[in-house]
Amino acid sequence: VTTADIAYAKKMGLAIKLLATSKKIGDQYSIMVSPKMIGMSHPLFAVNDVFNAIFVKGNMLGDSMFYGSGAGKLPTASAVAGDIVEAAKVNGNTGHFWTEEKLALADVSTVENKFFVRTTAAAEEVKAVFGDVTVMNDVVANEISFVTEKMTEAAYKECAAKLNGIVSMI
């Protein structure tokens, strides 16, 4: 994430947050940590500085957020690195601590997301590849940005391969 990405997000009324997300998709689970753009109306938008939050959508509970002071950047980075190493050790197989049932993880390339893209390509080229997207061109000179419709990461990569000049993607 660059200062230009942050400037684009601000211009769109969004904030870029590093989120750990999990979602059940059929009989599999999508689990990832990645930067996401969050709108001002979302409770996570206001989480800043040393504070962390967990936002939960439950079928009975509805939307709930748990908010508090975090551990700081170095302890948190160490914990994340430890979690990644542990996940690699179990080769993608995880289980609940209260059951022996294994959880099937969804292939990240099959999970749908919207993608924020910056490029030096012309708006016409972008629309020819990604469809009728809204293009923003007044933040960084000689560059445009857009947000895709929901698509899988595999579909995004296929489209991105057809477009020259991609500067960044979130």
Region locations from a protein language model:
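ATP-dependent carboxylate/acyl-activation modules
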Residues: P43-T99, L105-T110
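Low-complexity, glycine/alanine/valine/leucine- and proline-rich hydrophobic stretches
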Residues: S34-N59, G70-L74, F130-A141, T148-K150
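A conserved regulatory-domain signal marking ACT and ACT-like small-molecule sensing domains
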Residues: G82-I170
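Fold-independent oxyanion-binding glycine-rich loops
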Residues: T21, P35-M37, G58-M60, G68-S69, ...
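Substrate-binding/catalytic subdomain of NAD(P)-dependent oxidoreductase enzymes
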Residues: V1-A46, F51-A53, G72
